[in-house]
Amino acid sequence: MIRISTQFSADLPGKFSLAAILIVSGVANVEAADAAGILENSLKYPVARRDSHLDDYHGEKVPDPYRWMEELDSPETKAWVKAEAELTDSYLEKIPARKALKERLTKLLDFEKFGMPFHAGKRFFYSHNSGLQPQSDLLMTDGLEGKPAIAFSPNSLPKGVSIAGYVASPDGKVLAYGLSQGGSDWTDWHFRDLKSGKDLPDVLRWTKYYHPVFAPESKQIFYSAFPAPAPGEELRMQDLNNAIYYHALGTDSSSDRKVYARPEHPDWQFQPHLTRSGHWLVITAGEGEVGDKGLENVYALDLNPKVKDAPVIPLVEGFEAEYLFTGEDRGLLYFQTTLNSPKGRVVAVNPTDRGRGRERGGGRTEWKEIVPEGTDAMDTAAGSVTLVGDRLIVRTLHDAHSLVTVYRLNGMREYEVNLPGIGTASGFGGTPNDKQIFYNFVGYVTPPAIYRLNVKTGTSHLYRAPRPSFDSSQFETKQVFYPSKDGTKIPMYLVYKRGIKMDGTNPTLLYGYGGFGISVLPRFDSARIAWLERGGIFAVANLRGGGEYGEEWHRQAIRGNKQKVFDDFIAAAEWLIAQKYTSTPKLGIEGGSNGGLLIGACVTQRPDLFGAALAYVGVMDMLRFDQFGQGAGWVGDYGSPQNPEDFKALRAYSPYHNVKPGTRYPPIMVITGDHDARVMPAHSFKFAAALQAAQAGPAPILLRVRLSTGHGAGPTTSQVIEEKADAYAFLMANLEMEQP
């Protein structure tokens, strides 16, 4: 299983003029008068051809009239997307707030930003942005207080190319940097000699999701890669036949040795981890669930040169639970796991037991429990348990905010880190020898601040804090609990300006995700301040399906119970209205990826409940999701369309298949990235086309295609400002909010 951290211009493809499109297709007879009063004339949607395609699922004939949109590079698809882009641009350009919003967002984002320092050898590295740079530079210093120099500047890259990650060699002399074309998940890894500033000839291609790992000598690399896709199939190709490879610096990657693969299980994906000693290559294997909460097998390969042709040792098989590799100490490998502990615990195993350490059912003596399961769930994000300075630093979640506790390696609890408040703590990375480490703390209205922790004493000191141009004290954050449809209490954060009146007239933006065991925790977004400044409320519902309360919370809303996620979100909206925070005409909703599915399902189930909706990179065709990219790996959460019982549940809520002609839908903007290889853009294309054809009311249905971006990764600062200005302008206009 892979965990991915993401930080949320060319012309549109195709050379077809709008006139040519109209000649070929005509103009749709579906017209929508502008609900916000922006346009003088009604919207005329470009025609999307409806064909008679039918699929047979377990004896049920299911229409798919926009199947042709899955051919992303076809002239017809390109022409339709171009016409949709022109329509959306013409609508957004007429919103008075758009220009002022861009100006305000530019000011809000214009402050110096620092990333957390990390070290390799004698060098320290950290990201830095002076304010409005397109992408942050990576700086390096000799020692923590040394003079900074640029290790790498993504701002010198060609247009459309963005940085996907960095890895420094253990001696700090070589920097591996990943490049993404247009924000795609596909990443090419290059290597730079930091002394000369020149790139080495080595390039690792067709990697996704995982960073490469260096051996302690800094000359050897292990990495995960896929076979090269056929030309034009980069966004459609399923994530199959992954393998771990070995690369020696200075050699051609075409001769790299395949270290581990399972051709009999083409859907398995592998993440390499190298122990600090270099003795063991630890491989976690997942059944295709990338970036999501899945179940792992764990294997270990002895890299001791005296052990020739060492076999791969199976430590855990059977995909029984989640296993996250934490580190190595004195011959023991440490893992965070959910086996027999839905809220998580820390265990250790000696791999020299040669496979006798498989943990089944009640557990085996070869596995030693270090930190038992507690009342709060361990954060499932990568790095939630770190082995640093002969201690384990464990991040847990209490009602969807961070707690951090430090343990000795024998499991003895030492202390709880005194965090600045209610928010999200991350980082805590380092080596077993480090005495001081860094962590990041962030809240909904407080940008990330960096703290320095003395691991032995437990004292924290502020190391760096940003200086934004707004006063965070004017805002209030509070948490409430509301009942869902079945009575389950769901936590929700509310953020708003102090002194706001709860009279049902406040424009409110409700956000949700609810899937794959991913916890939605407090995080900062400069653009959100512009919403709050104008009297808007921002609400975050911590829905079931996430990981906020551990694996049981996740499992309550998967496969046949996925409807509970939508029930939780709808109940949040109803509660906000009943408590006079807002009202239907003032209530906007947003979500992305699995959260985009959430928005699609909720607007098709309850179009009467919402005043406007933003659906980002959503999974909208739940009967075809497993046919593209990493979609097959989502079956654990969604179920399989090939399974009759799963099909019934999927068919019942699939947004694309539940758009009903003659329905008055609220204003909706469907947003996707043209390089999204994770959730293929066709999901959004088909959903938007179906909504436009079905719309019986006056509200606009728009499709916005983000250029040179993927599944949330890749946009420059100016692109972020543009996208946020468009989104908030759309909401402000359609929720009749005070505009700047």
Q: Where are the regions that the model predicts?
A:
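C-terminal substrate/ligand-recognition segments
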Residues: 335-339, 385-390, 394-399, 482-490, ...
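Active-site lining segments that contact anionic ligands and/or coordinate catalytic metals
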Residues: 269, 278, 293-298, 321-323, ...
